[in-house]
Amino acid sequence: MKHIRNFSIIAHIDHGKSTLSDRLIQVCGGLTDREMDSQVLDSMDLERERGITIKAQSVTLDYKAKDGQVYQLNFIDTPGHVDFSYEVSRSLAACEGALLVVDAGQGVEAQTLANCYTALDMNLDVVPILNKIDLPQADPERVAAEIEDIVGIDAMDAVRCSAKTGVGVDEVLEVIVAKIPPPEGDPDAPLQALIIDSWFDNYLGVVSLVRIKHGSLKKGDKFKVMSTGQNHTADRVGIFTPKQTDKTELKTGEVGFVIAGLKEIHGAPVGDTLTLAKNGADKPLPGFKKVKPQVYAGVFPISTDEYENFRDALNKLSLNDASLFFEPESSSALGFGFRIGYLGLLHMEIVQERLEREYNLELITTAPTVVYEVVMTNGETIYVDNPSDLPAINNIEEMREPIVEANILVPKEYLGNVITLCIEKRGTQVNMVYHGNQVAVTYHLPMAEVVMDFFDRLKSTSRGYASLEYNFIRFDPADMVRLDILINGDRVDALAMVIHRSNIRHRGLALVEKMKELIPRQMFDIAIQAAVGSQIIARSTVKALRKDVTAKCYGGDVSRKKKLLNKQKEGKKRMKQVGNVEVPQEAFLAVLKLNE
């Protein structure tokens, strides 16, 4: 056990986490050069394309150190993006230490800070590493000072390396062995193993990645999942080197996989504890908070016969993604679908893209909303995540919207732009600290504004230098109203949205204008209106197509023409009473893209 080191890498997006892990694998000979592929651990196509890490992965490497001993390094990859901070806290729970990788050109960013504090809260040893020193703009001295100043850990003798060229990678391995403590645990105690992650394999069933805290798990052992109380047999146990390699047992302190032929993912929920069926442990391991979805959206299959496939796809995906929440929903405009809860907008995009890609579904998503706390006139409090569930205005005593605390790190030349953006988003400034060239600003912002397009706008006003990290703090009373879209006097439930009263004019106008371009002309006029309660605030009309009924009249008897025109008018009026308008898919998407 003295020779085991469990660690993960914390870094901001694009600071070279995945490249560094490739180098570590290469140096330790986990894969032959032919199998070496860049970003080995980002196994999803989507991860590769966007260049981000989404799922936590693990690798076990054998490293022969300079002192002649062979160490077993268990390395758990973590995502860097704010929406996946939950995946990070899980990965950290399985480690004794973390490498804090910072880009020597860019310096510390908000994300890194947040994850680093998570690690320090869990009493992990954090080892700073300066990456990308091969770049011309690298300034390791300044960045080391920045780490000490902002994060508050000693960084003067931090290892300097370049994962791309391979410089300094050996030093990184030596530092891991020297600075990260070996696991503590009792090999003779009853088994306690933490499930770090589980995913579904079409051939093997559920594969769980576990960290053995106490005891050991052998192939063929009967074990019990503590939250469900069900017993299973371990058909296979082993490690990833990154390839799956079977072993006979996993010992205390090791990280590896267990396959027990489970058919359904919820049989081994992430963050749960495994113990032996006979004389097992009494209490589960600490270290997991159920994560709450922050953003909800309705998702519907474009053709209704895809509904079953869609449900299966969601079930499979939720095996893989512990933070996904969904429940059935039906809409008069879009048919049957699901209301899905996400951690944030990036999570939402990725889930939707994975559904469309991996399961060949065609989906349509309604505008994302956050959860509102509504106090009714009869004194009860309800939580609403769907605009069409909102009670009538006269039954609402007060509406409260979720407020987040956003920590933004930004170079000082862009500070003005960022403050302007935060004010426009109805934010209140809480704190501002200068660290050398960077400024750390703290704002309280309404979550609804943050989930819409805040991140993109923040990046564009600061030329990509600002970084953001946010968490929910409380509900605050706010003047929120529901904006309905009426088409020929009928409410379209899928287009309703909850917005602040100060935005309704501007938003309503933009919406009806946009809808006017997208709804095809019919044989009668279509009125598109935006309404709040019973008050109409904007309207536009899609004009009718008409046939030239007077074309066949020679000569000019005006009463004949009038008769024909009046007859046409009558017909249009009748049509309007019975006709119904198909709202095309593009119109729903337009609502989402309104901000751009």
Swiss-Prot record:
Query: Binding of GTP: at which residues?
Result: 14-19, 131-134
Q: Which keywords has UniProt assigned to this entry?
A: Cell inner membrane, Cell membrane, GTP-binding, Hydrolase, Membrane, Nucleotide-binding, Protein biosynthesis
Q: Which domain of life is it from?
A: Bacteria
Tell me the GO BP annotations in alphabetical order.
positive regulation of translation
Q: What is its EC number?
A: 3.6.5.n1
Membrane topology qualifier: Peripheral membrane protein
| UniProt keyword Cell wall biogenesis/degradation, yes or no | no
Q: What is its main location?
A: membrane
Q: Where in the cell is it found?
A: Cell inner membrane
**Gene3D superfamilies noted in UniProt:** 3.30.70.240, Elongation factor 4, C-terminal domain, Elongation Factor G (Translational Gtpase), domain 3, P-loop containing nucleotide triphosphate hydrolases, Translation factors
CDD domains, A to Z: EF4_II, EF4_III, LepA, lepA_C
List, in alphabetical order, the Gene Ontology terms for molecular function in this entry.
GTP binding; GTPase activity; guanosine tetraphosphate binding; ribosome binding; translation elongation factor activity
Q: HAMAP family, alphabetically?
A: LepA
Q: What does this protein do?
A: Required for accurate and efficient protein synthesis under certain stress conditions. May act as a fidelity factor of the translation reaction, by catalyzing a one-codon backward translocation of tRNAs on improperly translocated ribosomes. Back-translocation proceeds from a post-translocation (POST) complex to a pre-translocation (PRE) complex, thus giving elongation factor G a second chance to translocate the tRNAs correctly. Binds to ribosomes in a GTP-dependent manner.
Q: What protein name applies here?
A: Elongation factor 4
Q: Supply the source organism for this entry.
A: Shewanella sp. (strain W3-18-1)
**This protein's encoding gene:** lepA
